[in-house]
């Protein structure tokens, strides 16, 4: 089973290992349900008070959200820093935020992609986390992220948030209808040309 790293909350740097599929199953089964439902109530209440301003609502839950457990999909880390990576998992996460009415359709599109290992609703209830299976080569992580982000935009018409940091945190969530495909097909990476490789126009 593919292993990823988990921290108790955003302030903690010490990591422990957890199976990637075990984490997804915990999102589905409701391990963090009470905490997530409380966060989503705060988010919705702020949305109503702020006239539908999702950015203000996100700011309102930011401090609470950072108390949640979180994983680093990229693999096994000795500490929560890029230089703490011990073994690359070949999994990376793409974030889609502030989706509103676009969420359901976007989730359907992403869940139909053979390269998606998991797709679930974020803690706010207004975003998605899409986890892709990519080649297990840390040297190609940036290109892998760019390829996955491009694919997400092609599938959904929505530009993902930029976040190719190999030690990027993904907070625990609750989604009984999360998509999970432990046999996701590895995504072929498109290599970004270097300055030397780029041809003059």
Regions found by a protein language model. Name each.
Residues 1-90, 196-201:
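DNA replication initiation on ssDNA origins
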Residues 98-116:
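Short amphipathic alpha-helix segments
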């Amino acid at each position: 089973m593919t292993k990823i790293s988990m921290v108790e909350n955003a302030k903690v740097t010490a990591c422990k290992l957890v199976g990637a599929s075990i984490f997804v199953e915990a999102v589905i089964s409701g391990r963090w349900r009470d905490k997530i439902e409380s966060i989503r109530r705060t988010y919705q209440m702020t949305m109503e008070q702020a006239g539908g301003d999702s950015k203000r609502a996100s700011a309102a839950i930011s401090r609470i959200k950072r108390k949640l457990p979180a994983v680093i999909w990229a693999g096994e880390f000795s500490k929560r820093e890029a230089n703490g990576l011990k073994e690359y998992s070949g999994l990376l996460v793409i974030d889609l935020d502030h989706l509103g009415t676009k969420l359901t359709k976007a989730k359907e599109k992403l869940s139909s992609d053979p390269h998606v290992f998991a797709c679930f609703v974020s803690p706010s209830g207004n975003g998605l986390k899409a986890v892709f299976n990519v080649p297990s080569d840390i040297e190609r992580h940036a290109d892998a992220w760019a390829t996955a982000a491009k694919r997400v935009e092609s599938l959904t018409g929505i530009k993902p948030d930029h976040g190719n940091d190999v030690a990027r945190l993904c907070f625990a969530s609750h989604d009984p209808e999360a998509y999970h495909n432990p046999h996701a097909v590895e995504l072929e990476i498109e290599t970004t040309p270097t300055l030397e490789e780029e041809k003059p126009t």
